[in-house]
Each structure stands twice: as structure tokens, then as C-alpha cells.
């Protein structure tokens, strides 16, 4: 039988180096530093500073921006444990500054630090630390050694933060959303961002909704351009783009992305990207169901599938065009 020898905890010097000279009271006690010594060292003119409740800076100089973030994270994460660095993530504008977003102030100018913790944690705001609670499982990404919320969540919390501060606060909404999905290190997908903004209830804010709609439309336009190239390669006739289909009596049916009236074939591209609310999703699904009920053959194409298996999408499109719709009801096309 083999035995695993437990790894000894890092010394105070090693811990201070890892956490940029910021430590908690429990970490100090675990290394033999009594409360009396901590109090003495933090007196005026002493070698240490108390930054937040139970969080100390092992230097007499003021904290750097990074040390302020370490203090915020350790304050929110500790739970009476010696190595309490889990259970909290930095989010909002502070996280975006760590990620390097150009549209938000740099770290020295960030005046508040939002920290996300589980809903059941009993923790109060302290100093510049604002506690945000979530009922979802925390997901952390290490950025310069600090636990940060994923980009989509950090963006949503930053927008909530700016919205709560009032209408007079400048909100670089469009710039932040664009940067979230367009940076070379693949910040997040448009779908992830849309889902997070919807979950946070931000899509009812006009500026957020307008910027999100712009992103969604751009994503779909990109995929539609690729589909157009595929249609040309398959030697298919040029389809109608975004026509409004109605019954002879004027009853609305749907607005497919592409439609070949001579074959009764419609194509829908990433239809979920047309929808932010459940009501919009129901409207789109209703149109698709009506087309299928009336005999139109509907081909569904996603950008991910088109990128991964372009030949298979082309084969499906050619087959659909060859077979055509089934007993298609005569429709008016606007």
C-alpha cells in the first residue's frame, strides 16, 4: 500500500510572495503569528497595514492596484479556513480591467471591486469591496493569479454596476460588448454573452439591447455570407433573402432567412440569434412550424456546423433543393 505524504503548507514568506504581500488573519495564525503581534504591527508607523476586516498588507507602503484586488478576493473568499482562496471571484469592471479591456478604466482608476460569492454566504460590503451574490455555481478563470468571473458574467456585472450608479454615468456599452466577443484570445461567444445579459435582466435596458441586437445581427450576417458562398458553390439559383411569406388572404406565415419559392425550400441560419426574449423565440419557432405545416422544406444551418462540416451542409442543401417541398400551399411573397 502506498501512502501520499501531505504537502506542507507554504511558509509565510512563500505565501506573501504568491499573494503579493496580502494575507488573512487565519493564514497568519496558522503560521504561528498571534493576534497580539498582528495588532502591534498594524499600529500607526508599524510595518503592516490592515486593508479590510481580517486582511492585512505586510508592508508599510500603500497597496498597489493589484494588492487591492488581492485584498478584496481574500476578504470575500476566506471562511475561517487557513487556505481560504476559493468561493469568490472578482467580477464587474475590476475583472474587465484585469482582462485588459480597453473600454474600461485601467486598474488604478477602478474605485470599487465587485466580488461574486455564493448566495448563502453571510458577508457584508467592506471598504471598496461590493459583494454580489449568485445562486449559480461559481466559475473562475485565473487572470494574473487572481480568480475572475468568465468574461460574459464580468461584462453583465459591469453593466449592472453602471446602471445602478445612475443615468449620468457614462456607459461604454457598445464598446465593451464588441470587445468581449472580438478580442483575439476568444473572450466569449455572442451566444454566451446574450445568455448572460438575459439572465441578468439587462436586455430591457435600451442601450444594452441596442448594442446586443447589433452584435447578434453581425454574427448572423457573417454566417449568411458563408451560406451565400456555399449556395454559389452548389450551383443553386439565387434565393430570396428575408422575404415575408403570407397566405393568399394575407395571414402572416414567417420571414425565413433564405427562400426558393420555385422549390418550396427555406433556410434558417442560427435562428436562436434572432431571439433575446422567450417571446421572440416563440415567434420565430411559430413561423418555422407554420412553414413546415404548409409543406415547405426548412433547412436549419448553424454557424458552428457550417465551420466544422461545410461539405455535409452543402450536401444537405443540394438534397433539399432537389426534393423540394411537399404539396406546398401557394403563398404570397413580399
Question: Can you describe what each PLM-predicted range is?
Answer:
Residues 1-204, 322-323, 329-334:
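Short gly/ser-rich loop at a beta-strand->alpha-helix junction or flexible surface loop bordering the NTP-binding
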Residues 2-7, 34-37, 181-334:
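Surface segments flanking catalytic/ligand-binding clefts of nucleic-acid enzymes
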Amino acid at each position: 500500500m502506498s501512502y501520499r505524504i501531505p504537502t506542507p503548507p507554504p511558509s509565510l514568506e512563500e505565501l506573501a510572495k504568491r499573494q503579493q504581500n496580502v494575507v488573512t488573519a487565519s493564514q497568519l495564525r496558522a503560521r504561528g503569528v498571534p493576534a497580539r503581534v498582528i495588532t502591534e504591527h498594524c499600529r500607526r508607523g508599524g510595518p503592516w497595514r490592515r486593508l479590510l476586516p481580517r486582511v492585512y498588507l505586510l508592508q508599510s507602503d500603500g497597496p498597489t492596484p493589484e494588492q487591492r484586488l488581492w485584498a478584496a478576493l481574500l476578504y470575500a473568499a476566506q471562511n475561517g479556513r487557513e487556505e481560504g482562496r476559493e468561493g469568490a471571484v472578482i467580477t464587474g469592471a475590476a475583472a474587465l480591467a484585469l482582462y485588459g479591456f480597453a473600454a474600461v478604466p485601467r486598474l488604478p482608476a477602478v474605485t470599487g471591486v465587485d466580488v461574486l460569492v455564493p448566495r448563502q454566504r453571510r458577508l457584508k460590503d467592506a471598504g471598496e469591496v461590493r459583494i454580489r451574490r449568485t445562486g449559480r455555481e461559481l466559475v473562475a478563470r485565473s487572470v494574473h493569479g487572481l480568480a475572475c468571473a468568465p468574461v460574459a458574467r464580468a461584462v453583465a456585472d459591469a453593466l449592472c454596476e453602471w446602471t445602478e450608479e445612475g443615468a449620468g454615468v457614462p456607459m461604454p456599452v457598445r464598446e465593451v460588448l464588441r470587445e468581449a466577443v472580438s478580442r483575439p484570445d476568444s473572450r466569449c461567444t455572442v451566444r454566451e454573452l446574450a445568455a448572460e445579459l438575459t439572465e441578468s435582466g439587462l436586455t430591457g435596458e435600451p442601450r444594452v439591447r441596442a448594442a446586443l441586437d447589433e452584435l447578434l445581427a453581425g454574427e448572423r450576417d457573417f454566417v449568411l455570407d458563408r451560406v451565400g458562398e456555399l449556395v454559389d458553390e452548389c450551383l443553386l439559383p439565387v434565393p430570396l433573402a428575408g422575404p415575408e411569406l403570407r397566405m393568399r388572404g394575407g395571414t402572416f406565415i414567417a420571414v425565413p432567412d433564405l427562400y426558393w419559392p420555385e422549390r418550396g425550400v427555406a433556410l434558417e441560419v442560427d435562428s436562436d440569434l434572432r431571439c433575446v426574449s422567450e417571446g421572440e423565440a416563440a415567434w420565430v419557432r411559430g413561423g418555422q412550424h407554420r412553414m413546415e405545416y404548409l409543406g415547405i422544406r426548412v433547412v436549419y444551418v448553424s454557424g458552428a456546423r457550417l465551420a466544422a462540416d461545410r461539405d455535409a451542409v452543402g450536401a444537405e442543401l443540394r438534397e433539399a433543393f432537389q426534393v423540394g417541398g411537399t404539396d406546398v400551399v401557394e403563398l404570397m411573397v413580399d
